[in-house]
Regions:
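A contiguous, well-ordered beta/alpha segment that forms the leading edge of an enzyme domain
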Residues: 1-120
């Protein structure tokens, strides 16, 4: 996830709890990492469609709700802009206006079709 995390647990089985938390984070990262070409999210980004696992579907559905609640200020389809600015690779650059316009034309969660299991 390229995110620094710190876990603190107290109690009799605190080490086990931390180990389980780390395993769960790794499992979810395996589903959602855009830096892993075999992740569920990467496959959907590459094909433009796909059947979602239960975990991904729950996050996707909540993301779509937040998109609606914020009038589109939060948008699940922002990945083309992230790529353009170089966030996934760490090779950052300021895009040209025409590049921004092209990438922005791909960002619009309202165009996503969702039936509760499959996103298109």
């Amino acid at each position: 996830m390229d995110t620094f995390m710190t876990f603190t647990a107290y109690g009799r089985e605190c080490e086990k709890a931390v180990e389980e938390a780390i395993l769960e984070i790794q499992r979810l990262d395996g589903l959602w990492s855009v830096g892993n070409e075999f992740s569920e999210v990467s496959k959907i980004n590459a094909s433009g469609r796909g059947e979602l696992s239960e975990d991904t579907a729950a996050v996707f559905e909540r993301g779509m709700e937040i998109c609606e609640e914020t009038g589109g200020l939060f948008d699940l389809t922002v990945y083309p802009l992230m790529q353009l600015w170089g966030f996934p690779t760490g090779v950052y650059h300021v895009p040209a206006k025409d590049e921004l316009e092209e990438a922005l034309s791909l960002v619009d969660a309202s165009r996503v079709q969702w039936n509760g299991k499959t996103a298109v």
